Curated annotation (Swiss-Prot):
Family: Belongs to the ribose 5-phosphate isomerase family.
Active site: 107
Full protein name: Ribose-5-phosphate isomerase A
Top-level lineage group: Bacteria
Record keywords, A-Z: Isomerase
Class of enzymatic activity (EC top level): isomerase
Species assigned in the record: Burkholderia vietnamiensis (strain G4 / LMG 22486) (Burkholderia cepacia (strain R1808))
Gene encoding the protein: rpiA
Gene Ontology biological process terms from the UniProt entry: D-ribose metabolic process; pentose-phosphate shunt, non-oxidative branch
Length: 230
């Protein structure tokens, strides 16, 4: 199967998981990116079962609305039973690198309030150690050089994310992103806490403190379900 076919496979598997485990009338937390889009497309077929969704980005909001799925602000919701999102990398503990699509801060906020985080990914995203995929850090623009120096001191190579026109990429929150290459993150929870404590960091794209509860992993043999210890 192609990577796109695997994404559609796990998107449908996530919709099936939601149908089986989330009661009718609930609100679903939805991530951002090409794999999350496959979940949205599959969820559209059963949208009448649920009140709607909480979105993690402007792009996801637009896709949800295009399917006629009502989008709620997180502040309107008392409880969120499930959050479904992709990952750029995921390790054996359920810790992830996320943010390749630029929505890491809102993704982390929505994930933090959900009872269950369901990661959907193709098999290429499973890694023994996080860091081959550049680690995104959303930063307040005036802090980007200072943050870059801190990253370099840890052995990373900071690269400012830019648009195709060469201008700094701006997040939905009005900030910039530094992508850090050359890392091997053996202790993702400690590394997440360290980077998040730097002045000027909005959030780092490590999801270790709040990692995945389970992963629906698309492989040539079908969908593998991996459950991570709490």
């Amino acid at each position: 199967m192609t990577q796109d076919e695997l994404k559609r496979l796990v998107g449908q598997a996530a919709a099936d998981y939601v149908i089986q485990n989330v009661p009718e009338g609930a609100v679903i937390g939805v991530g951002t990116g090409s794999t999350a889009n496959c979940f949205i497309d599959a969820l559209a077929a059963v949208k009448s079962r649920y009140r709607g969704a909480v979105s993690s980005s402007v792009a996801t909001t637009e896709r949800l609305k295009s399917h006629g799925i009502k989008v709620f602000d997180l502040n309107e919701i008392d409880a969120l039973q499930v959050y479904v999102d992709g990952a750029d990398e995921i390790d054996a503990s359920g810790a992830m690198i996320k943010g390749g699509g630029g929505a890491l801060t809102r993704e982390k906020i929505v994930a933090s309030v959900a009872d269950t985080f369901v990661c959907i990914a193709d098999g290429s995203k499973r890694v023994p150690v996080l860091g081959a995929f550049p680690l995104p850090i959303e930063v307040v623009p005036m802090a980007r050089t200072a943050i870059g120096r801190r990253v370099a001191a840890l052995g990373g190579v900071p690269v400012l994310r830019v648009t195709k026109d060469g201008a700094p990429y701006i997040t939905d929150n009005g900030n910039e992103i530094i992508d850090v290459k050359g890392l091997q993150i053996a202790e993702p929870r400690a590394f997440e806490a360290k980077v998040n404590a730097w002045p000027g960091v909005v959030t780092v794209g490590l999801f270790a403190e709040r990692g995945a509860n389970l992963c629906l992993l698309g492989t040539e043999n079908g969908v593998e379900t991996i459950i991570y210890p709490a």
